[in-house]
Amino acid sequence: MKKYFLKRTSLLLTILGCLSFACTNHNSETGKGKWISLFDGKTLKGWHGFNKTDTIPNWTIEEGAMVCLGAAADAHGGDVVTDEAFENFELKWDWKISPGGNSGVMYHVVETPKYPAPYETGPEYQLIDDIGWPEKLEEWQKTGADYAMHLPNEKKKLKPVGEWNSSKIIFNKGHVEQWLNGERIVEFQAWDADWMKKKADGKWKDYPDYGLAKKGLISLQDHGKKAYFKNIMIKVL
């Protein structure tokens, strides 16, 4: 009996060891806790047009940057999204826009024909020419804002149009941080009473599914002007 017990124990430990190894490999492959590149600097692999399965006509590669050509006639049709969905993450990227430019980075985007554009579900880190935009901008429309929800603070330091900026979004179990050029400029808790009130009282009151998804795609916005992105990295939390 003792010998049989030892054999069973040894077999169980071996199985557990294999499972542990498999789980470790799975985490390594999915990049949990490690930085994963979402853009290889050469191709659009890993991205596709929102609600599209064909090629991406509005985007190209220039000098290692993913470039939006600004070919969309309006805010619909030219946005791209990742092939993979993310829940809790730290996302960082470098970006610049053209004079009078407007773009954004969205997360937790739900992709179905029900939604004409990513912004109907995905919160947006706003990117825009704060100075050269042809119309007066409200603070919630300016670069670094959690668009139409939370304003950037006094630590915001935006580089001139045409120069590279660095941005970051951290989403971890509803706690959200937005960073610009090394400074945390926005911080809030998704889905709390304050968040719900902002949604109900503002631009998103007519978009019932805005910001509710807990997992979704990352999206880069085409809003009619050239925008440049590189060093797009994500770490699953």
Where are these regions (language model features)?
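Bacterial Sec-dependent N-terminal signal peptides
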Residues: M1-G31
